[in-house]
Curated annotation (Swiss-Prot):
Its EC number is 2.3.1.74. This is Chalcone synthase 2. One of its GO terms (molecular function) is naringenin-chalcone synthase activity. It catalyses: (E)-4-coumaroyl-CoA + 3 malonyl-CoA + 3 H(+) = 2',4,4',6'-tetrahydroxychalcone + 3 CO2 + 4 CoA. It holds the Pfam family Chal_sti_synt_N. Signal peptide: none annotated. The gene is CHS2.
């Protein structure tokens, strides 16, 4: 007789979960941040709010963002005036858009990741789909399974309404799936479209305006599995450990609420302070087993919630400016794409490391950290090990 323990042992993979491919995608419509305030106040019929527009201009100027990509074009917004109001019933119109577009953009990113992976898509055993943009049944995971032509027996997990920390969450889940299911190949997709959060300006709610200055659309996909097949699968990063925590005294710091008017976004002023005050504790807990205490010896992938968060983290940990280069680059080129951001940064890091001829995928360094921050305040901390280039 075979024992349960023997069955269990046979089910487990040998090595750590490994990122084997990364793909990214954005909608074609690109928005220039320097001219965005003019466009935004015009399309929302708010040009008479001159003081508010000046404030928004300053927000955009300070955002460290050059451009963003958005599914919402001028034509779409003109057809949906309620989406342009600050608080008008518009959920149906928004849902009609994202239910179709979120899986579609996810497919674009997933197709690129699968191509780089180089294996037939029939070998994908699990799908993790994550979006903060709308909800539906059957979910975006089901729609993507159909769009890609994955096997009907693929094991799906749908994550809705997580927020900006979820790029870390999906890596944590993919790690557990890959390491506990021998031969598993997990397709992870984060797809975000701001059609749920876009709204006109309000004098009384400047936090909503902050979101309008920062958020952009994008999708990222990765393939994760343990024990890469030599000569066939190319490892990029190993997922060594993953943790999640709720920061103390942070209730209500970042909230989102799905209402008739779409997804409303609420932000307290001291989010950068709350994150920077608590980040060292998360780092110590994550890196104590590795005896690492020099944060400049790591490569860094941090969710770029906004420039103030990055500045304060840099200051608190005395990080050298180049540590957050990849993070700031993605913020500058795409804005805050919620859960997809950290996967875009992983992609940027391995590409720039290869381009510069560095010895590892992690800017020539062995160990790295990936941080996700979002509603809660929830923090995801993932310890990464790079791979020789």
């Amino acid at each position: 007789m075979v024992t349960v323990e023997e069955v269990r042992r046979a089910q487990r993979a040998e090595g750590p979960a490994t990122v084997m491919a990364i793909g990214t995608a954005t909608p074609p419509n690109c928005v220039d941040q320097s001219t965005y305030p003019d466009y935004y106040f015009r399309i929302t019929n708010s040009e008479h709010k001159t003081e508010l527009k000046e404030k928004f201009q300053r927000m955009c100027d300070k955002s460290m963002i050059k451009k963003r990509y958005m599914y919402l074009t001028e034509e779409i917004l003109k057809e949906n005036p309620n989406v342009c109001a600050y608080m008008a019933p518009s959920l149906d119109a928004r849902q009609d858009m994202v239910v179709v577009e979120v899986p579609k953009l996810g497919k674009e990113a997933a197709t690129k990741a699968i191509k780089e992976w180089g294996q037939p898509k029939s070998k994908i055993t699990h799908l993790v789909f994550c979006t903060t943009s709308g909800v539906d049944m059957p979910g975006a995971d089901y729609q993507l399974t159909k769009l890609l032509g994955l096997r009907p027996s693929v094991k799906r997990l749908m994550m809705y309404q997580q927020g900006c920390f979820a790029g870390g969450t999906v890596l944590r889940l993919a790690k557990d799936l890959a390491e506990n299911n021998k031969g598993a190949r997990v397709l992870v997709v984060c797809s975000e479209i701001t059609a749920v959060t876009f709204r006109g300006p309000s004098d009384a709610h400047l936090d909503s305006l902050v979101g309008q200055a920062l958020f952009g659309d994008g999708a990222a996909a990765i393939i994760v599995g343990s024990d890469p097949i030599p000569e066939v699968e190319k490892p990029l990063f190993e997922l060594v450990s993953a943790a999640q925590t709720i920061l103390p005294d942070s209730d209500g710091a970042i909230d989102g609420h799905l209402r008739e008017v779409g997804l409303t976004f609420h932000l307290l002023k001291d989010v950068p302070g709350l994150i920077s005050k608590n980040i060292e504790k998360s780092l110590n807990e994550a890196f104590q087993p590795l005896n690492i205490t020099d944060w400049n010896s790591l490569f860094w992938i941090a969710h770029p919630g906004g420039p103030a968060i990055l500045d304060q983290v840099e200051l608190k940990l005395a990080l050298k400016p180049e540590k957050l280069r990849a993070t700031r680059h993605v913020l500058s080129e795409y804005g805050n794409m919620s859960s997809a951001c950290v996967l875009f940064i992983l992609d940027e890091m391995r590409k720039s490391s290869a381009k510069k001829g560095l010895k590892t995928t992690g800017e020539g360094l062995d160990w790295g950290v990936l941080f996700g921050f979002g509603p809660g305040l929830t923090v995801e901390t993932v310890v990464l090990h790079s791979v020789s280039t």
